[in-house]
Each structure stands twice: as C-alpha cells, then as structure tokens.
UniProtKB/Swiss-Prot annotation:
Keywords, comma-separated and alphabetical: DNA-binding, Isopeptide bond, Metal-binding, Nucleus, Repeat, Transcription, Transcription regulation, Ubl conjugation, Zinc, Zinc-finger
Family the UniProt entry places it in: Belongs to the krueppel C2H2-type zinc-finger protein family.
Positions in coiled-coil regions: none
Protein name as it appears in the record: Zinc finger protein 331
Keyword Nucleus: yes
A GO CC annotation given for this chain: nucleus
Gene: ZNF331
Domain annotation KRAB: ranges: 6-78
Molecular function (Gene Ontology), one example: DNA binding
Location within or outside the cell: Nucleus
Length: 463
C-alpha cells in the first residue's frame, strides 16, 4: 500500500508573523476553510489514479477534521499558548469499494515558537517563478498566485457584496470591503486611539508614532512608511508611466490618478457636498470645496498673514513678495508668476478657446472661466456673505461685496491719497490726474475718461 507524496506548496498561502497577528479568529477560520477547499480541489484532479486503500476517510471524517480545525484557535487559548498545525497532502489509494479520492491531512500539533506564529507549510520542492501567465508572461512562485493573477485578464469578479453589489476578484477583498457597511474597526492604535478596519492599516499607522520609514529610495535616499509609496516615488526617477487610459491614451505613474482621470470620460462624480449638492471627481476636491462653506483657510503667508484655502494658492501668492516671474511668453516677452497664467496668455496669440459651454456654445480660453459662466445657466451662487446672506456666482464678487460691511478700501491713489474699495475705481480715478481719455466715440471722435461716460454720450447719437 504505497502512497505517493504530493506537494501542496503551489496552493498554500503563507502569512508573515506581523500579518498573522493582525487576523482575528473569524479571519483565521476563513483561512483554514480556503486551505481545505484548495486541497480538495487539488485531489479531485487525480480521480483516475487506481490504488488500493482500506482506510480512506469518509465524508464524515473530512467534516470532523474541518470542524476540529475551526476550534483550534479557541483550544489554543485554553492551553495558554498558540498551537499550529502542519498539513501533508497525500495521494490516497482507491479501495475495492465505491470510494473516490479524498484528502488525507495528517495534522501534527506542536506549540508555536512565538505568540501569533502563522501556520507554515512544509518545504517547497518546485522552482521559484515556475508558473507563468500565458497572457502577459508574468511568472509566479505558486499556482494559486497565477490563478488569482489571471482574473485580471479575464475580468472575473466572483465575490459580490450583498449590500451594494460591488464585486471583487478575491474573497479577502470582499471581507475587507464589508467592514465599510458594518462600520467595524477592530484594530485600535494604543498611542492615539485611532481605529482601523484592517490590521495592515494599523501597522502602517503606527509608523507615524515611531517615525519608522523602512522603505528607502536607492537613487535619492528618501524614505517612506509604505512600500507602495516607494514604488510610486521611484517612477519619478525612471519616468515610468504604467497606467494608460484606454479612452484617450494618456498615461499615469499612479493607478489612483488613472482612476480619477477615467471619471472625466464616464462623468462619474462620487464625492458630493452635503451643503450645496455639488459633486466632484476626487475626494481632495471635495475637501477643498468645503472650505468655501466653512471659511477655513489653513494656509497662511508668513510675510503678510494672508490665508488661503489651498496650498498651491499660497505658493503662487508668495511669488508676489519675491517678485519672481519665471514664465515668459516667447511671442511678446510678457512674464508671469505662474505657468498656468502663461498657458492662458498664449491662447491670446493662438486664439484657442478649448472650453465650450454645452448650453449656449460660448467658448473660453480657460476652464475656470467656463465653470463661472455655467453658473449663469444653473443659477448656482455658492459664495454667500455671512453678514447679510447675499450670494454670488464668483468668489471675487463676494470679496468685493464684503468691503461694504468692513469699510476696507485697499486701493489708494498715490497722487491725492483718495482710497477705493475696487481696483477698477482707482484706475478710472487716476485718469483724472493723467488726463487720459481712452474711450473714444466712433461716431464723432469724442474721447471720455470713463466707459460709462462714453455710453451716456452715445445715447445722443442713438436718439
């Protein structure tokens, strides 16, 4: 009655010490269920083997093994230390009866060397990376890794959430996702009390307190708390952009940027403001938008004390103090503090207006102007005065309006000292000193120093 040994390293799943310690009892039970299922599937592939064995386990025995293993964690607690089980999969012989191949697992109990030691399989005998994907050529050291990887090509997502119908490629992804609906956060930081859905998130979070940054870039020496941060950072050195949009061909160095970009094509805006209902493509845009309602301006200039809702606004503002204008137009030589201003300016020379209103067809040379224009059609007035409740389409209009309540007149004439609340008022006033009359009537040639004076004059011709 010889039995042939079959390695199951290609279907085994190993956890590190750190990962195993983070699993709760339910997750460990799930692990054993998955392992048993994998073993059963492997054995079922060898139904044609004809051996003899009078001591094959019945289906009842298999269920007893499964039930016994599920209680292993609870039994280990009563013993005061952890026990782990080692499994050896053997190819059973077929008896003269009507037995089919079943799984023989010889569980050998032994105490763990350290608290929370994960289960270990026996030594592997196959070559590393011997399982290759026929679609992309990527190789794996285990068969189950290849099986999981192939779901990327097939698009198969067999694990569906009953709450929201979202589907996943792997069962552990579904388990983690379901915590979003239950609100379960079993992993709590002992230092600050912050709780997490997943143990891996807690492990990474703890590095904030310890200052540990184990992932270091070999090119520049910069260190990171997470491995994926290092991977993303290294693409700055290599220029690698692995993630390509199938709709327009644009490539990205980070997958989350591709996900956000795809929403431009799909029109999806999953992040909605509860105050005004406005929706956004990405969460960071919603956070920034909320500051309009709260008035929060966390980024303050150390030179003048002016505060901003976004850090890039502060960076741009600081160039006012330094006088820096590094972006110069090649057509006319005009220089700008910000690259975006140069791009917009160049459209004056080219006549390009890429931003078109779908309601009326009017086109603009920058997206911001289109966004503001669209509010004329929607009636949206997101900028509200806290003093009187008056609302405005544009933020600049609110700033100007607030000066009525504060009495601030920041625009002073250097000739006579007279101050104004708006810049255009000062510009018009200065013409009284210079004698400039820039508004000329096309009918009679008369010139005026104010646009409203020209309009009043033109009524003479119209009447």
């Amino acid at each position: 009655m010889a039995q042939g040994l079959v390695t199951f390293a290609d279907v085994a799943i190993d956890f590190s010490q750190e990962e195993w310690a983070c699993l709760n009892s339910a997750q460990r039970d799930l692990y054993w269920d998955v392992m048993l299922e994998n073993y059963s599937n492997l054995v079922s592939l060898d139904l044609e083997s004809a051996y003899e064995n009078k001591s094959l386990p019945t289906e009842k025995n298999i269920h007893e093994i499964r039930a016994s293993k599920r209680n292993s964690d609870r039994r280990s607690k009563s013993l005061g230390r952890n026990w782990i089980c080692e499994g050896m999969l053997e190819r059973p012989q077929r008896s003269r009866g009507r037995y089919v191949n079943q799984m023989i697992i010889n569980y050998v109990k032994r105490p763990a060397t350290r608290e929370g030691t994960p289960p270990r399989t026996h030594q592997r005998h196959h070559k590393e990376n011997s399982f290759e994907c026929k679609d992309c050529g990527k190789a794996f050291s285990r068969g189950y890794q290849l099986s999981q990887h192939q779901k990327i090509h097939t698009g198969e997502k067999p694990y569906e959430c009953k709450e929201c119908k979202k589907a996943f490629r792997w069962g552990n992804q579904l388990t983690q996702h379901q915590k979003i609906h239950t609100g379960e956060k079993p992993y709590e930081c002992k230092d600050c009390g912050k709780a997490f859905r997943w143990g891996s998130s807690l492990v990474i979070h703890k590095r904030i307190h310890t200052g540990e940054k184990p992932y270091e870039c070999k090119d520049c020496g910069k260190a990171f708390r997470r491995g994926d941060e290092l991977t993303q950072h290294q693409r700055f050195h290599t220029g690698e952009k692995d993630y390509e949009c199938k709709d327009c061909g644009k490539t990205f160095s980070r997958v989350y940027k591709l996900i956000q970009h795809k929403r431009i094509h799909s029109g999806e805006k999953p992040y909605e403001c509860k105050d005004c209902g406005k929706a956004f493509i990405c969460g960071s845009s919603l956070i920034q938008h909320k500051r309009i309602h709260t008035g929060e301006k966390p980024y303050e200039c150390q030179e003048c004390g002016k505060a901003f809702t976004r850090v890039n606004y502060l960076t741009q503002h600081q160039k006012i103090h330094t006088g820096e204008k590094p972006h110069e137009c090649k057509e006319c030589g005009k220089a700008f503090r910000w690259g975006s201003s140069l791009v917009k300016h160049e459209r004056i020379h080219t006549g390009e207006k890429p931003y078109k209103c779908t309601e009326c067809g009017k086109a603009f040379n920058c997206g911001y102007h289109l966004t503001q224009h669209e509010r004329i059609h929607t009636g949206e007035t997101p900028y509200k005065c806290k003093e009187c409740g008056k609302a405005f389409i544009y933020g600049s209009s609110l700033v100007k309006h607030e000066r009525i309540h504060t009495g601030v007149k920041p625009y002073g004439c250097t000739e006579c000292g007279k101050s104004f609340s708006h810049g255009h008022q000062l510009t018009q006033h200065q013409k009284t000193h210079s004698g400039a009359k820039s508004y000329e009537c096309k009918e009679c040639g008369k010139a005026c120093n104010h646009l409203n004076h020209l309009r009043e004059h033109q009524r003479i011709h119209n009447s």
